[in-house]
C-alpha cells in the first residue's frame, strides 16, 4: 500500500474514536511531563548536594552522573517504555478495527521486562550507528521500528528473535517507511502555530498510520509469512 492509502485507512479507522484517542495522548503527555519534571528535580537536588559537599556554590558536571541522576533517568525510561507499549497496543487495535479502550495503556505490564530489554539492545545498536554517521543511525532506527508491534502480537517471542524479525521484515521496506515518516513533516510544522493543540489529532493519526504500515507488512499470513517473504526476496 502507498503512503496515501495507509493514511486514508488510518483516517477511516479513527472515525468515532478521535476523542478517546486524544485523551490517550493527553494522559501520556501529562504523565511523561510530570515525571520529566520530577526526574529533573532529582538532577537539580543531586547537583546542589554536590555543590555543598565540595564547598562551592555551583557545581556542574557532564562527565559523571550521581546515583540520584541515574535513578531519575532509569525511572523515566521504565515508565516511558511502559506507556509507549500500552499506547502502541491501543492504536494497533484501532488500526485493526478492534475495540480499543483507554485501559489498554496499562494492560501490557507483563511485557515490560522484555520491552525494556529490546529497547536497551536496539538503543545501543542505533546509538553506535549514529556515532559512525547519521545515515547508518537512521537506517538502524528504521530496521528496529517493528519491535514494539512484534512484541505485542507475539508476547512469547524471544528478545533476539524480535530484533531479528524486525530487521528482516524491514528489508526492502526501509525507504517506504522513511517516506511515510517524511510525509508528516508538513503537519508536524503546524504544531508550533497551534501551540501543540494539533497534537491531540495528529499523533493518533500518525500512530494509526504506522500501525497500518505494520499490518500491511504482516498481511493475513502473520509475522512468520512476512519474515519468510522478506528473506526470500533478499536472497
Model feature map: region roles:
Residues 1-235:
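Hydrophobic alpha-helical membrane segments
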Amino acid at each position: 500500500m502507498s503512503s496515501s492509502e495507509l493514511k486514508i485507512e488510518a483516517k477511516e479507522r479513527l472515525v468515532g474514536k478521535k476523542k478517546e484517542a486524544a485523551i490517550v495522548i493527553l494522559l501520556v503527555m501529562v504523565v511523561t511531563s510530570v515525571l520529566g519534571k520530577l526526574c529533573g528535580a532529582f538532577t537539580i537536588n543531586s547537583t546542589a548536594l554536590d555543590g555543598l559537599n565540595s564547598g562551592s556554590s555551583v557545581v556542574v558536571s557532564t562527565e559523571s552522573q550521581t546515583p540520584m541522576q541515574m535513578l531519575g533517568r532509569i525511572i523515566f525510561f521504565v515508565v516511558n517504555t511502559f506507556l509507549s507499549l500500552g499506547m502502541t497496543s491501543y492504536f494497533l487495535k484501532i488500526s485493526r478495527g478492534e475495540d480499543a479502550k483507554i485501559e489498554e495503556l496499562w494492560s501490557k505490564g507483563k511485557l515490560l521486562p522484555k520491552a525494556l530489554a529490546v529497547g536497551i539492545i536496539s538503543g545501543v545498536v542505533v546509538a553506535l550507528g549514529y556515532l559512525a554517521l547519521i545515515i547508518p543511525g537512521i537506517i538502524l532506527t528504521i530496521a528496529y521500528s517493528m519491535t514494539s508491534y512484534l512484541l505485542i502480537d507475539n508476547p512469547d517471542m524471544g528478545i533476539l528473535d524480535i530484533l531479528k524479525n524486525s530487521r528482516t521484515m524491514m528489508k526492502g521496506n526501509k525507504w517506504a517507511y522513511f517516506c511515510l515518516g517524511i510525509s508528516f513533516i508538513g503537519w508536524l510544522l503546524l504544531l508550533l502555530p497551534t501551540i501543540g493543540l494539533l497534537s491531540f489529532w495528529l499523533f493518533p493519526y500518525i500512530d494509526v498510520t504506522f500501525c497500518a504500515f505494520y499490518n500491511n507488512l504482516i498481511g493475513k499470513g502473520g509475522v512468520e509469512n512476512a519474515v519468510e517473504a522478506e528473506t526470500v526476496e533478499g536472497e
